[in-house]
Amino acid sequence: MVTTLLVFFSVWKAYTFAEAQREKIYVLDEGKSLMLALSQDLEQNRPVEAREHVRRFHELFFTLSPDKSAIEGNIQRAMFLSDRSAYAHYVDLAEQGYYNRIISGNMSQRIGIDSVRCDFNTYPYEVVTYAKLSIIREKSVTERSLVTRGRLLNSTRSDNNPHGFILEAFRVVENRDIKVYDR
């Protein structure tokens, strides 16, 4: 009786050990040694990916140089990360002559993201971005406070949208001068 229990216990333990080993992935390290590849649940990284998605959109959309093709290229890449609300904002700025003034004035615009706040308790995820814009002219620099809002929707990952989000309902809620100083 004891021997039978010991055999069944040993077989069961060996089976569970083998199952656990099958769930592990090993990677060959430059042809020399095996390393255990640690897998993570994709959902664990979602908050980090969301903030990086929003950060990347803002960098593409608000970093401008006095070059029409560079502006159009960045805006086109930003549109892969957002919906028509961002395109509508781009069209508004274009109709107001903003991009033409950047080009003709030989100005540059840089963005520095202070923080990205995402609410993951509701879906779509509410996002607020706090940033500073620097508009660099030949003789002066204008610093502006920028606050934007939007919502993130889960989307399919692609080469053009590696984080798998779409920024929707994008709007600028604050864009005011903080200071102007000479260069």
Could you tell me what each predicted segment is?
Residues 1-25, 29-48, 69-183:
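Structured, amphipathic secondary-structure segments that form assembly/contact surfaces
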Residues 53-64:
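Solvent-exposed, amphipathic alpha-helical segments
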